[in-house]
Amino acid sequence: MRFQLFIYFYFTIVVIAGTNTIQQFSDAGDRLITSLRNLDNNGTYETLTAEKVPIIEGQIQNISAKYEQHTFILKGLEAVLNYKVKSLDNNERESLEIEYEKVEKALDAALNVSPFEYIKKFKEVSRGKVVNALENLSREQNRITINGGREDEKEKEAREKKKRLDRIKRILTVSLLELGLAQGVADLCAVAPFACLLGVTVGSIGFIFWLALIYNAIQ
């Protein structure tokens, strides 16, 4: 009887948690749309807004429906949307046309690029290879040299890599508490300190790289 009650309460909690996650993601979508609308204070882009907002609303609804059984995905995407809202509200933005285009493109990627393929791909790689890859990334991030104020092609490439790594680092920071993926941190901290922000199971690395794809598209 106690076991049955435990099962009942467990599934009740799971259902409630899932419902709350869907609502929180939808709320983040609403805040994003409001922030986009607020960029057009004088109504110059009224036609553009009337065209784009229904598309974005539909994308958010479709994402909620597609991932309603995978709350960790919705929580990650919620973090991305919240970060975008914050950047828009802080005037870290481009033209309204470009911002609508970036949001639409990012949400389209969330719908059509499977996070499960990323997770599967990383699960097929041994933990040793993943840790080694992260170690190499960390080394690349720190290996930037400037000679006489002049950069050669390799140095420019290194800077571009650093920019990409910094973006990944930012999404890790944003997502840590909300994703609840803090597992197996210790073995990674020794080789890639920035990755300590996320406890890394091999599958969760794949998910984070998928999430970084969405993050890069929307920023």
Swiss-Prot record:
Where do glycans attach?
Answer: N42, N62, N136
User: What protein name is recorded for this chain?
Assistant: Outer spore wall protein 4
Q: Subcellular localization, per the record?
A: Membrane
Topology in the lipid bilayer: Multi-pass membrane protein
Q: Which family does it belong to?
A: Belongs to the OSW4/6 family.
Chain's role = Involved in spore wall assembly. May be involved in maintaining genome integrity.
Query: What are the boundaries of the signal sequence?
Result: 1-19
Gene Ontology biological process: ascospore wall assembly; chromosome organization
Query: Describe its PTM?
Result: N-glycosylated.
> Which residues span the membrane?
171-191, 194-214
